[in-house]
Amino acid sequence: MRIVADENIPLLDAFFAHFGEIHRLPGRAIDRAAVANADILLVRSVTPVTRELLEGSPVRFVGTCTIGTDHLDLDGFQQAGIQWASAPGCNARGVVDYVLGSLLTLAEIEGVDLAQRTYGVVGAGQVGGRLVDVLKALGWNVLVCDPPRKSAEGGDFVSLDEILQRCDVISLHTPLSKAGASATWHLLDETRLRQLRQGAWLINASRGAVVDNTALHDVLHEREDLQAVLDVWEGEPQVNVALADLCVLGTPHIAGYSLDGRQRGTAQIYQALCAFLGQPAVIKLDDLLPKPWLAQVSLDASSDPVWALNMLCRGVYDPRRDDADFRRSLTGDTASQRLAFDALRKHYPPRREIEGLKVRLEGESGGLAQLVRALGAVLV
């Protein structure tokens, strides 16, 4: 069996070497010639897997070790009888950690009380749903916009217009889609961006084109009261440098790049491939993950929740380092910037998740226990 795989997928040999020969390539270099003799294709979000790419190839299974599927031609797969799998939720905790770290950084820069802000979460799936749980565990005011879930479940979901009108902080967690009633391409266009409240913060850690980047640049240039945090960009790996200069934090699509999340994505695709081949999944991720360097934290149960959040979050992640590395990469010509963007992702240093922490609460736990559980950490 011949496997073609993105070279940046972690634990490739550990999970897939026993299936057959692995041919590794940069994700953006996977083309028709590369898959001409492949049985299995393993990718990340940087590789568009289209009908044209796979035409004439023997590929029977496509696995993307990522949470999203907008880079996969699912209709084409169905017509060609190709099995596929993604890794829903694999990096959700890492993205939530990124958003929380960004909020703490913004609060420090702006000198504001996070508890006094109203939060709008757009998209309440694997990532957004977990973020909502954390914000509610903190006792903060949260509005949620998710039209597909509202149609399916009813509930207390609100419109995007209400989010724009009422929320001081807006965090985007939608997939990218161009068609249908819930299309998200340029969901925040110039008209909607101009509706942002005075002093609003906008965080996008979903897909770059969910926000019209040109319009966002223009609005940020005109309104100094707004703050933006962008981890994703239209036209990646090319970045709108002028827009990046106006963002309080900018990073190279690494919000979900925790060590745990990336390796979890590989494990999920391994399990899906085993199911496709009718083989037992005997390799366990827990046997491969290294021990975290910060394993346990003790907190006074009466601690202020924001202080506790800061201790737990900063213990595993601070986005300012990634922001600094990203800004250093935006020098030189366009070609150099594109290469630097991918290099930052390829050589991203190991980062663990709050979920891997064990937390001991001294005294009556009360509401702090709810926060720890919402963060995914383990109470001991």
Curated annotation (Swiss-Prot):
The encoding gene is: pdxB
Oligomeric state and interaction partners are given as: Homodimer.
Primary location class:
cytoplasm
Annotated source species: Pseudomonas savastanoi pv. phaseolicola (strain 1448A / Race 6)
Transmembrane intervals? none
**From which domain of life does this come?**
Bacteria
Q: What does this protein do?
A: Catalyzes the oxidation of erythronate-4-phosphate to 3-hydroxy-2-oxo-4-phosphonooxybutanoate.
Cellular component terms per the entry's GO annotation: cytosol
Which lineage ranks, top first, belong to the organism behind this chain? Bacteria, Pseudomonadati, Pseudomonadota, Gammaproteobacteria, Pseudomonadales
Q: What is the recorded name of this protein? A: Erythronate-4-phosphate dehydrogenase
What family is reported? Belongs to the D-isomer specific 2-hydroxyacid dehydrogenase family. PdxB subfamily.
Catalyzed reaction equations: 4-phospho-D-erythronate + NAD(+) = (R)-3-hydroxy-2-oxo-4-phosphooxybutanoate + NADH + H(+)
